[in-house]
């Protein structure tokens, strides 16, 4: 009868197997690292707090004080602040004591240029391709296909708070395209 040995020799990992394992690990790590930004691109960014809104910021990133804002601006002035999602937003002075209850997003709906207010002509005029919007941001001349987006503007603790506009657009009577 043949006698079997109790200890079975298990061969050590050879150099070739080790190099294959090391190469596989390196390639997998690089591929996952390259794939991360691609996957991240398709995940939408988180929105702000639950209906809390965004405090308007000036050009230096400081909160806009309503009392100081009204002291330094005339009735009918439209002034840019940093609004929702960091977009430039016009705040309109309604009277010496109040701002309008809406802000006008300054990003042109044609190609995304910032649209300046032309006080002499009482309208917004895009410098890129000539689109024009009335005093409320409604498109009056193309090539821009849509009116400027709106946001709610309200005063809380002497600060301007902007919240998303989800109701019917008062300028067109239609559902807002931006929500």
Swiss-Prot record:
Domain of life: Bacteria
Enzyme Commission no: 7.1.1.6
TM stretches of this protein: 21-43
Gene Ontology cellular component annotations, sorted alphabetically: plasma membrane-derived thylakoid membrane
Catalyses which reaction(s): 2 oxidized [plastocyanin] + a plastoquinol + 2 H(+)(in) = 2 reduced [plastocyanin] + a plastoquinone + 4 H(+)(out)
Recorded GO MF terms: 2 iron, 2 sulfur cluster binding; electron transporter, transferring electrons within cytochrome b6/f complex of photosystem II activity; metal ion binding; monooxygenase activity; oxidoreductase activity, acting on paired donors, with incorporation or reduction of molecular oxygen; plastoquinol--plastocyanin reductase activity
Annotated residues for binding of [2Fe-2S] cluster: 108, 110, 126, 129
Membrane topology summary: Single-pass membrane protein
Gene Ontology biological process terms from the UniProt entry: photosynthesis
Domain spans labelled Rieske: 61-162
Family: Belongs to the Rieske iron-sulfur protein family.
NCBIfam families: Cytb6fFeSPetC, PRK13474.1
Subunit-level organization: The 4 large subunits of the cytochrome b6-f complex are cytochrome b6, subunit IV (17 kDa polypeptide, PetD), cytochrome f and the Rieske protein, while the 4 small subunits are PetG, PetL, PetM and PetN. The complex functions as a dimer.
Protein name per UniProt: Cytochrome b6-f complex iron-sulfur subunit 1
Species of origin: Trichormus variabilis (strain ATCC 29413 / PCC 7937) (Anabaena variabilis)
């Amino acid at each position: 009868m043949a006698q079997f040995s109790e200890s079975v020799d298990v061969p050590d990992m050879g150099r070739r197997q080790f190099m294959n394992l090391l190469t596989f690990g390196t390639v997998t790590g690089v591929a996952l690292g390259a794939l991360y930004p691609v996957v991240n691109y398709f995940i939408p960014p988180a929105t702000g707090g639950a209906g809390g809104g965004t405090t308007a910021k000036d050009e230096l990133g400081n909160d806009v004080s309503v009392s100081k804002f009204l002291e330094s601006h005339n009735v009918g002035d439209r002034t840019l602040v940093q609004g929702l999602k960091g977009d430039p937003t016009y705040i309109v002075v309604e009277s010496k004591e109040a701002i309008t209850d809406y802000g006008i997003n300054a990003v042109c709906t044609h190609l995304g240029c910032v649209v300046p207010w032309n006080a002499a002509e009482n309208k917004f005029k895009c410098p890129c391709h000539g689109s024009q919007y009335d005093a409320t941001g409604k498109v009056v001349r193309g090539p821009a296909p849509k009116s400027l987006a709106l946001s709610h503007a309200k005063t809380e603790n002497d600060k301007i708070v902007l919240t998303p506009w989800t109701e019917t657009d008062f300028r067109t009577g239609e559902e807002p395209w931006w929500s």
